[in-house]
Amino acid sequence: MCFFAHSQIEVIQYNAGWNSSNDVQWCNDLIDCEIDYIDIAAKPKQQVKYKIEVVPTIIIFDDGEEIERFEADISFAIQATEEDVQAYIDEILANKF
């Protein structure tokens, strides 16, 4: 479960139904953020708006601004770890103080 902190940090995982075997399950374990999942096949405008070229892609937003992006490799599997993404979230929070 992701607990919402004082900032507006949001982590969005973009994927597609045909690639559901590569969903990033640990996203739900991130803390101090809001989490969302967008299926780009169901919401193609989101794919265009955020220039999603490969799935899955995880984007960290702070107050609506993209801070960091993690993209899958050629095998459609993401190489970033939960620790990598959480470190960016923690850094964003630390910089707010």
Question: How should these model regions be labeled?
Answer:
Residues 40-45:
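N-terminal post-signal-peptidase region of extra-cytosolic proteins
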Residues 50-61:
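Structural micro-motif
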Residues 60-97:
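Non-catalytic, surface beta->alpha helical segment in thiol-disulfide oxidoreductase systems
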Residues 4, 47-50:
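Structural motif
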